[in-house]
Amino acid sequence: EEISVVGFGDEGWSELTYPPLTILKRDVEGLSRRAVNMLFEKINTGHVIEQDYYADVELIIRKSTRMLDNGPFGEEAATPESIVITKEEKSRLRAGNFRVAISFHYTGTSWAELHEKGIRDELEQYGIDIISVTDAHFDASLQNAQLEGIRLQKPDAVIAIPADDKETKEQFRELAKVSKLVFLSSVPENMEKNSYVCCVSVNEIENGINVGRMMGQYCKGKHVEAGFIIHGAVFYGTRARDEAAEKIISEQYKNIDIKAIRGFGEIENAYQVCKDMITENPQIKVLYVSWDRPALLVIKALKEMHREDIAIFTTDLDYKIAQYMESGIVKGLSTQRPYEQGRTAAHVVAKSLLSNDVPKYVG
């Protein structure tokens, strides 16, 4: 049960095994079409296309894989599919007039928008109302004030991401007295295990490892000096991600020399942190940035310094960062699945409104 198994190929039987097999599915049809087009090109024109083509590969996740990360109290991660809502429970939910609030650490990104859409789409199935959505702008004091407002509304449940794992803990403890709490990605420090329902999380360690490996592949065969622009705040998700990226570079890619590691704390500080780092370490050729929003400010700083030769690796996908991937300054990116995570959190909330039989950690 502790071993994950991944298959390569798209054979039909992989879905029929127990458990169903997670696979890397190649776009064989697309590759075949390209081959036929090249053949007809040669027949019709005599021109031989000398170009390498690669089949696209899609990761289809099924139940043969499990998260390596554990919850705040060492819990193994349960799969979203393990939480089942019966027809009878659906009817009870629709008749229950339940109310839910959402407290985001910050919004204004595709990541947050997709989380909210996933939550809304899932809760709508059960007739559950969303009575408020707050944006703390990564300000713990502001989130505490917003949580007090939510507490006075007395929703049946709250889906929340703490802006700061330490500074918000007392307010979340008060909120837990009147509402069921489901956390996304992070649980405030020293929250008692029985004071919240569940933490729904992506594997941030794997997220960081993915970015580190992309950096390693990019720098393969050459000595490169790198800089790490990390979050540096009391926030579990980014801390786990940043540490994992740094660790895999240090342990597995000895050709990459990490010259500087600096935290920006608040997003707007990433611009100056980058400028200072590159001014002091002009030999840096590769930068890790904790996620896309600060990465956009790092790109702005690099452009002003005429250092677009520096390759950037980051996490989370938004329209602007995708444009920079196309132009080439962003060389690698690992992203979560925010819509699915939002739906899972809402699914957990719906189940918890009727039952205490909910896993403590889902991912």
Language model features: what each stretch is:
Residues 1, 8-11, 25-34, 54-56, ...:
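Hinge/beta->alpha junction and helix N-cap segments in small-molecule ligand-binding domains
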Residues 80-100, 219-223:
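Immediate post-signal peptide segment of exported/extracytoplasmic ligand-binding proteins
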Residues 9-21, 165-206, 217, 225, ...:
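Flexible loop/hinge segments that line or gate small-molecule binding clefts
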Residues 1-70, 306-363:
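Flexible loop/turn connectors
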Residues 47, 51-67, 100, 104-108, ...:
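An alpha-beta-alpha
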Residues 120-133, 250-253:
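Signal peptide-proximal N-terminal region
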Residues 1-14, 30-40, 59, 151-177, ...:
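Hydrophobic alpha-helical
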